[in-house]
Amino acid sequence: MIKIEQANVEDTPAIVAFQLAMALETEELRLDPPMVQQGVNAVFNDPGKGFYLVARDGNKLISSLMITYEWSDWRAKTVWWIQSLYVLPEYRQQGVFRQMFDWLSHQARESGTVGGIRLYVDNRNLNARAVYEALGMDGEHYRFYELMF
């Protein structure tokens, strides 16, 4: 049975490994492991940055994602951004992300302080886009731009 819960610091090695695998698989990027470790640690050390959600099959960590926060002055609420999603290949197409998304949606609605959930996806990742659309997410309203340093 799959269990969805907030991650704890003991999950750090698996989350780092997931991030390295995800970047290579989806964007053909080889990330610097110590930098990713530092980034994951920063979230656990500063809850204001966000939190990690994980899925477990028994004691095995099978998926993780990170939630970061955006303040919406239009809604006077926080918007949760889903980032860094990874599901182990052998658990894909089994509804793991749907369970995680349902957990997040429930928590967000119940909080009264969250105005919505957003995510971004690489335009080339057609499989992920299909999953998000099947969950009722709308990818047509905004275009995402970035300037990274």
Regions found by a protein language model. Give the residues of each.
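Conserved GNAT acetyl-CoA-binding A-motif
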Residues: 109-120
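Conserved acetyl-CoA pyrophosphate-binding loop and the N-cap/start of the following alpha-helix
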Residues: 91, 95-103
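Conserved active-site alpha-helix within GNAT-family acetyltransferase domains
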Residues: 98, 123-141
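Active-site acidic-Proline motif in GNAT/NAT acetyltransferases
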Residues: 88-90, 94, 123-124
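Terminal substrate-recognition subdomain of acyl/acetyltransferases
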Residues: 110, 134, 143-149
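Acetyl-CoA-dependent GNAT
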Residues: 6-9, 17-77, 83, 101, ...
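Hydrophobic adenine-recognition pocket in adenosine-nucleotide-binding enzymes
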Residues: 7, 85-87, 121
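A conserved beta-turn-beta hairpin within the catalytic core of GNAT-like acetyltransferases
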Residues: 71-82, 92, 113-115, 140
